[in-house]
Curated annotation (Swiss-Prot):
The keyword Nucleotide-binding applies. Cell wall formation. This is UDP-N-acetylmuramate--L-alanine ligase. It holds the Pfam family Mur_ligase_C. It comes from Francisella tularensis subsp. tularensis (strain SCHU S4 / Schu 4). GO terms for cellular component: cytoplasm. GO terms for biological process: cell division; cell wall organization; peptidoglycan biosynthetic process; regulation of cell shape. One of its GO terms (molecular function) is UDP-N-acetylmuramate-L-alanine ligase activity. The lineage of its organism: Bacteria, Pseudomonadati, Pseudomonadota, Gammaproteobacteria, Thiotrichales. Its EC number is 6.3.2.8.
Amino acid sequence: MNKKILFLGVGGIGVSALAIAAKRLGAHVAGYDSVANKLTAKLEALGIVIFTSPNGVDVANFDIVVYSSAILSSHPLLSQARSLGIQCLQRAMFLAVLMKDFSYSIAITGTHGKTTTSSVLATLLCQLDKYSSFIVGGVVKYADSNIQVNGTDKLVIEADESDASFLFLSPQVVIITNIDLDHMATYNNSYQTLLENFTDFVSKESVKSIYLCVDDQGCRDLLAKYNQSDKNVTSYGFSINADVQIYDYHIIDEITHFKIRYKDDDLSFKLQLPGRYNVQNATACIIACLDLGFKYEDIRNALIKVTGVARRFDLYTKVISGHQVTVIDDYGHHPVEVANSISAVRDRYPNKKIIHVFQPHRYTRNRDLIKDWPKALSLADQLILLPTYSADEQIIKGAESQDIVKGLSGYLLADGFDHAIYFLEKLANENTVILIQGAGDVTNLVEILSE
């Protein structure tokens, strides 16, 4: 890739990964972000020049300008590049260009679990094939990075459906974890439009194999809608109707055990990640690796080393009011994700009381899923509900934190982190486990605890 490329919004996890990948593929790379952070420091350590002011950037020196969704079309550097006729590419559009440097690409998409599933597959392939690479939307714990370029053979990518940018991509293999109602403004609040976009994605000429979870209603709807016979379509899940069925799921000493029926073989696996949903995610990766020709024994040995992605069921031990308490930090922010996480906590800690500290994320999500929240938020033994993290949205009347728990009783409303800690100090002991959850800044609460 012999190009000079400027990355705008390079302090974000997605664009920073592309900048590193481009550099390792031979491009001359520079980046801009108005705020320096740990990611920009990492880029500078790799020899990438970082600008924090538009004034020092000579846009005319670059062949391509790549920008994140956080960069407005009126941004001076983007406006200048367009006026000079320089090729300007949104993040996913550049990822599509980058993919052409690789022989084989596997895209993971879906409303929930795509980052975790991408991390599982990335961890497997990096052990099974030293020339495999990945670019995903979270920090893969196995590699302590969201990006690794080990060659130009196989590439694992996370394909984002939230803004329909996955339609720019042309992978050879697609894994769909599920299809659910989220980011519906992208699809004009139409489930059929959402399904049509997924259908368009898997119908691309480049796609040869499709794996989807038949336990999910959205995936079943896609199967009913999709009728092309020129691709290898494999369903997986706990359902007896799955092409690859999962069974014998159980937990022993906090390790997840399960089996799959693959073709005529019954194969057993162990996984450090908790919950039925992670078994589904892992199964998609297992069968993709089996179909690539990797040996069962090698996959099994690699799977037990999978530790997932940062902020997905991260485990800590904290001292709270003199008690040693297990604390879990999790990114889940949709009713389905909340329910799955609480179920996973129950499976792993069946004899402990679950205290759920939840920070809702976006008023629009509260509003759009208002009927689904009460059931999900009733599943823990005690709910502590924080104010909604706005993500720069304006407050929507009837969509604040207290509105998503209408009809529930026994929950505690906290007005901030200090208030939540006050409740935890009263409630927590050795017989409790605390799940701290949300996509906003609630992860900071984990660090504050027991300081």
